[in-house]
UniProtKB/Swiss-Prot annotation:
Recorded family membership: Belongs to the peptidase T1B family.
Cellular component annotations (GO), alphabetically ordered: cytoplasm; nucleus; proteasome core complex, beta-subunit complex
Full protein name: Proteasome subunit beta type-2
UniProt xrefs under InterPro entries: Ntn_hydrolases_N (IPR029055), Proteasome_beta2 (IPR035206), Proteasome_sua/b (IPR001353), Proteasome_suB-type (IPR023333)
PROSITE patterns: PROTEASOME_BETA_2
Cytoplasm as UniProt keyword: yes
Keyword Nucleus tagged: yes
Source species: Trypanosoma brucei brucei
Annotated CDD domains: proteasome_beta_type_2
BP GO terms, sorted: proteasomal protein catabolic process; ubiquitin-dependent protein catabolic process
Pfam family, one: Proteasome
Length: 206
């Protein structure tokens, strides 16, 4: 999976970026596809993989989360529950006759209490998932050809108390490093933040 996806937690939000590359073998279709899908107002998933399975998987997850929210009378589904559902879907597909979903994902979310009596753990969360059904909550993570370079940068430069400006600057450095190091086109990155007020597009990262 050539496209690079990057995510990390900051002081009170999560930042996620994904390369806009959409290609069929050696043919580039577009450089500006948004691969960060909004599952709801406080959760996004950055998904890399083949076009058909990727689109099918994220739509399947999004629709099931909407159904579960309706069954819960409008109560927001937690990020951990969403990650568990995604992991179960990936692991189940791996063992089915239909075959696996060849996708790698970063799930970012910010859990907010539904009421004063709500005991759900609030705050920013980032989960790493791969096509084999691996699931782990991480402070930062990445997929794709640029992952080794970005991981090295984040090992050295990431801090849990990054401010909004520092987080955006670090994400831009990561994107620039991928563009410099990786031969496969990752010229355009789309970036989104998930703070307590809901998903926002970060225009200053590209």
């Amino acid at each position: 999976m050539a496209e690079t996806t990057i995510g990390f937690r900051c002081q009170d939000f999560v930042l996620v970026a994904a390369a806009g590359l959409n290609a069929f073998y050696y043919i580039k279709i577009t450089d500006t596809e948004d691969k960060i899908t909004e599952l709801d107002s406080h959760k996004v998933v950055a998904c890399a993989g083949e076009n058909g399975p990727r689109t099918h998987f994220v739509e399947y997850v999004k629709c099931n989360m909407a159904l579960k929210k309706m069954r819960e009378h409008g109560r927001m589904i937690s990020t951990h529950a969403t990650a568990s559902f995604m992991r179960n879907t990936l692991a189940g597909a791996l063992r089915s006759r239909d075959g696996l979903y060849p996708v790698n994902c970063l799930l970012a979310g910010f859990d907010v209490p539904a009421s004063a009596e709500d005991d759900v753990a609030t705050g920013a969360h980032l989960y790493y998932l791969d096509y084999l059904g691996t699931l782990q909550e991480v402070p930062y993570g990445c997929h794709g050809y640029g992952a080794p370079f970005v991981t090295a940068m984040l090992d050295r430069m990431w801090r849990p108390n990054l401010t909004a400006q520092e987080g955006v600057e670090l994400m831009q450095k990561c994107c620039d490093e991928v563009n410099k190091r990786v031969v496969v086109s990752n010229n355009t990155f789309i970036c989104k933040a998930v703070p307590k007020d809901g998903v926002e597009r970060v225009q200053s990262v590209s």
